[in-house]
UniProtKB/Swiss-Prot annotation:
The gene is hoxc9a. GO terms for biological process: anterior/posterior pattern specification; DNA-templated transcription; embryonic skeletal system morphogenesis; negative regulation of vasculogenesis; positive regulation of lymphangiogenesis; proximal/distal pattern formation; regulation of transcription by RNA polymerase II. Belongs to the Abd-B homeobox family. Its main location: nucleus. This is Homeobox protein Hox-C9a. Pfam families: Homeodomain, Hox9_act. Residues 155-167 have a biased composition (Polar residues).
Length: 260
């Protein structure tokens, strides 16, 4: 087993030497019989015929180390440092970076803290009427009205949803009334009493004269008075009844006053 090391080394060396000899023979022999022990020529030509090329080492792109990242939760900061040797090469110019007009500092941090370059339109001043149009109130309502007035105004202003619900409710109530149900008709029935029609001064004066002559009218006389005063017989009859009741009340009050 100890002789396997030298034997294996000798076998490998012999294979390498034979391979190099076959390669040289196939390269420099233009015509000649190919021996059975020779190996096939390689398809890719060797580069020994061409002069060797040496490339100058190129300096690394980023020579300086990256700056440490400060943990800031409010602003996203990209720690990019300018490389002076990249100004001549246009491949490394970051064209997407826009010029920064100024720097913004944060007063909550120390005076020697880092200043971050921000655009002037990043933080816009809020306008007074931006957040007031969504709830239907204007800036003047908040300025001149109290909280109670605003709540009452919201409650008194009907919304389209409440109007639609109320109209639908009235329609349902009308549909529930059964014309064949006498109870429902009696509850929701309108008054059949005619509207009161007051007498004119001329009619009242003529009726008073007639009452002084006679407290009770016959049917013929009632018909004549109604025709003259442009009234119905029923109106004349009712007026005389009310006038008699009034006269009885007045006489009763007089008698009571005398007894006292």
């Amino acid at each position: 087993m100890s002789a396997t090391g030298p034997i294996s080394n000798y076998y490998v060396d012999s294979l390498i030497n034979h391979e190099s000899e076959d390669v040289l023979a196939s390269r420099f022999t233009a015509t000649g019989p190919i021996s059975s022990s020779s190996r096939p020529t390689p398809l890719v030509p060797e580069c020994a015929d061409y002069p060797s090329c040496s490339f100058a080492p190129k300096p690394p792109v980023f020579t300086t180390s990256w700056a440490p990242v400060h943990s800031q939760s409010s602003v996203v900061y990209h720690p990019y440092t300018h490389q002076p040797h990249l100004g001549t090469d246009s491949r490394y110019v970051r064209s997407w970076l826009e010029p920064i007009p100024g720097t913004v500092s944060f007063p909550g941090y120390a005076g020697n803290s880092r200043h971050y370059g921000l655009k002037p339109d990043t933080f816009q001043d809020p306008r007074a009427g931006d957040c007031l149009g969504s709830n239907g109130r204007t800036y003047t309502d908040y300025l001149y009205c109290s909280a109670v007035d605003i709540r009452e105004k919201q409650q008194n202003t009907p919304s389209p949803e409440t109007e639609s619900l109320s109209s639908g409710k009235h329609k349902d109530d009308k549909a529930e009334l059964d014309p064949n149900n006498p109870v429902a008709n009696w509850i929701h029935a309108r008054s059949t009493r005619k509207k009161r029609c007051p007498y004119t001064k001329y009619q009242t004066l003529e009726l008073e004269k007639e009452f002084l002559f006679n407290m009770y009218l016959t049917r013929d006389r009632r018909y004549e008075v109604a025709r003259v005063l442009n009234l119905t017989e029923r109106q004349v009859k009712i007026w005389f009844q009310n006038r008699r009741m009034k006269m009885k009340k007045m006489n009763k009050e007089k008698n009571d006053s005398k007894e006292q």
